[in-house]
Amino acid sequence: MQHSDGRVELRPEAAEAIRRSPLYNKDLAPVPVERRNWTTYNYAALWISMAHCIPTYMLSSGLISAGMNWWQALITILLGNTIVLIPILLNSHPGTKYGIPFPVFARAAYGTYGSNLPALMRAIVACGWFGIQAWIGGEALDTFLAAIIPGWTILLGGPIGGHMVTEWLSFLLFWGLNIYIIYRGMDLLRKVENWAAPFVLIMTALLLGWAIWKAHGLGYLLTQQSNFHSFREFWPIFIISLTGMIGFWATLSLNMPDFTRFGHSQREQAIGQVVALPTTMTLFAAMSVVITSAALVIYPHMKMDELWDPIKLVGQFHNVAVIAISMFTVVVATLAVNIAANVVSPANDFANAFPKWISFRTGGLITGVVGILMQPWRLLADPSGYIFAWLVGYSGGLGSIAGVLIADYWFVRNKRLELGDLYRTKGSYTYSSGWNWRAVLATLIGCTLAWIGLVVPLLRPLYDYAWFVGFGAAAITYLLLMKIAPPQSPEALENRHGKSRVVGEAFYAPGSDSDKAKVVEQIS
């Protein structure tokens, strides 16, 4: 049933019928139109809260440590976020139109069971990010407690595994706080985002003012020199850094339907994202560039691998109130972004893989456990590895998935989906036993080309362009395969075997009384 504004929902009898499908659970169900109430402000606040986080801060400070000056770093970040905004908006559209999350949307291209491939690939990356953010939040909580509790650092003894026992305890406490909010649900998340976003911006601005005051102005920043003296020297570091910037939000470029399915309109969700993402990312990055550069003047004894981490930087302050307030801000910001960006999608992904056994809450708990097992304290050990290994590395795989999804929805299907069939084991998206081999093959080709540079030195430039290579190769391959070997329609298969087919958007379990809905006709 399509509304005048273009949004689609199931009729009541069809919505009731899909509940009997093994592909259904309440967390994956299409959101009714009356519950799609997120406005422009909600999406702007979502991006502001996600952008104002320590990993964003580390992006710009990491580029500075790589040799860029302030304007080179900011241009790289602005361009990267502008580019990644394109697939984000393209994949946001089906969420708002059909009210479906990312794993269900992926069924259209990959098949009802094949969608587990992109969903679980995305989930693994998100688990890694969850662990990283939880470790950062734990560091902030540890610094906060050390500021207000005398002797906190040595309270429980010496270091274990390279970190103090209180650091491990703070990490587990922050991890538990994330799990608590997951079990409270999405409504609590929206409330946290609405007040956390402006609060974090104000506190960061205060820290910026302090840095400029202590460094006696911005003269140091304007005279900062780049380590690259020609375009030829700058280009290699620029392109891999740009790929890393795109990789930073490549996860959200896939699973944005998890949020836009609550959108009140296409216009509101699009405006909220266009206004908030590139501007807030660049603004926050600019703040971190100024603060980090000022810190070089204020604390000349500190190394760059310490200055790039604002938690370690604030730990140098002698004012207990400043440390406590700053770290409280970091804890709130990290909590908001971690749940929004790194829990919603993998929780839905795990629920999609096993819909009858795993709910959103259970999927969130799995995300938290896997995040610990990925050892985030090791992922953050090296600032250059954070950008050039972690971000660039996974961008090739996620870019390949984005290429397939966008090619399928916008070019193969022209934005038209059979909503009910996304929840049917036998329908338009069944393909071969629930798998569309064309999408799987296209994804594998994209990933192979994006990552082959890691093992073949001669092809290293392909890895530097990992997201672009994966996206382009997968999209082109998928379009060619769908043209050369198009899947057979379910109607043709049913005509061949003389079976019943379903007309309209509904699912009928074996043995159900389909005559009641008057939507099944016999094909002989």
Q: Which functions belong to the PLM regions below?
A:
Residues M1-W70, L85, T204-L207, K214-L218, ...:
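Membrane-interface "cap" regions at the ends of multi-pass membrane proteins
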Residues A134, G138-A147, F199-S226, F248, ...:
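Hydrophobic alpha-helical segments and their helix-loop junctions in multi-pass secondary transporters
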Residues T40-Y57, S170-L177, Y183, G209-A215, ...:
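Hydrophobic, membrane-embedded alpha-helices of multi-pass small-molecule transporters
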Residues A119, A146-Y183, P198-L207, S241-M256, ...:
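Transmembrane alpha-helical segments of multi-pass small-molecule transport proteins
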Residues I77-Y110, R122-V125, W129-W135, I291-A295, ...:
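Juxtamembrane transmembrane-helix boundary signature
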Residues H52-T56, L79-P87, M121-Q133, P198-K214, ...:
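Selective recognition of specific alpha-helical transmembrane segments in multi-pass small-molecule
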Residues P30, I401-T477, I484, E491-N495:
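C-terminal membrane-solvent junction of multi-pass transporters and transport-like membrane proteins
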